[in-house]
């Protein structure tokens, strides 16, 4: 009876096929488990009743240090400045939140489905106010009111802005005033940030050091 030898390459192929099939099955099982967990969490979140949003999550802007100085502007620019001042002053009393690090599902689980529109509006208020501060800072800087621009930008930083332009302009103004200590403090604050903008801001600050 002749000897029958299985070619080594065939054994390797079968081994590879077994491992590949095993890993594929594991991935599919993991995917199914994750999908089931996601939809289970989603279903639970939709049933959560409205919960009070903790007061400490809200931002409380302070514009008491802003002077809104008189500027020598053309009529159209003067009207724009007047509108900007009104927007800043009226925004201060609006509720402001920044919960972008939480998914919609997590928001519903923590605060209830009914609070989603409330949260969305408060986040919109927050983002708008930060943009108003930046617009104001740029205008002040363009009209030789650097200290006023710094005050506005420092307030944005205090409110935990993650908008790069706030930090870029503030750092430039600090450097122009040779305020190395303030620049170091700003760098330390950015290092403690938990934001996708963090590294980009740090890279910019490093160039000024």
Label each residue range with its predicted role:
Residues 135-136, 169-170:
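Structural register within alpha-helical repeat arrays
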Residues 150-154, 180-193:
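Alpha-helical repeat scaffolds
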Residues 127, 160-161, 194-195:
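Short coil turns that delineate tetratricopeptide repeat
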Residues 2-128:
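N-terminal alpha-helical interaction modules that lie
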Residues 165-166, 199-201:
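TPR alpha-solenoid repeat register
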Residues 89-92, 123, 157, 190-194:
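A conserved position within tetratricopeptide repeats
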Residues 139-140, 173-174, 209:
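Residue at a conserved register position within TPR or TPR-like alpha-solenoid repeats
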Residues 145, 178-179:
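Residues in the short coil linking paired helices within alpha-helical repeat scaffolds
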